[in-house]
Amino acid sequence: MGYEYRAVTDPDTLHPLEEPFGVNENDPAGVYEPGMKTGAMVSSFVNACTAQTGVPVVGVSCAKGGSAIAKWLHGTPYYQDAVRRARKARAFLQANGYIIRHSAMVWCQGCTDGDLHTPKDVYKADTERVLHSFMQAAGAQACILIQIGNQRDEPELYLPMQQAQEELASEQGDIVLVSRQFKTFAAKGLMKDRFHYLQPAYNAVGTEAGRNAAAYWNR
């Protein structure tokens, strides 16, 4: 079972999880992209995770498509908005008697850095800073990392970002890589353009990621 905490539009209650997840959670001072959220892997992630753990999940949306890692560094509007939303969710749950068993961020980012030719070492260092700074500020125990896929027409373009993600998960015990499937979908015809995927692809990644996140928490 899953719920959404709407930190921007309705912060005084929980809503049953539905897609598009976070469709109206737009803050002009932070993450703001009206009309851009048309599909997601959140429901499949939550369903797969709760099937293994038996513990309900509360999700908080703060996703911004097409954003480079530099836009998420400590002190930026996106970073501050994400921390603000996470803290509001935690405060709401605690004030209403919920027991928070696990707290994590789910992260899937890097395609824009591939397009921008961000050097791998810069991307890796900035990503590590963003993830650990956010986890500390938001009280999250882990980062559930979903590896990005490939640009459909230039499949080598995102390899440095993928390699950086592999290294971070190998080196950092609190960064958990839960899916590598996105890079397989171009060959399966599951991309709708050079950058985006069809909903069955998101469902497959969400399901795999949810199962592996549950295995991490159940270990």
Range-by-range predicted roles:
Residues M1-R219:
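Cell-envelope and extracellular/periplasmic
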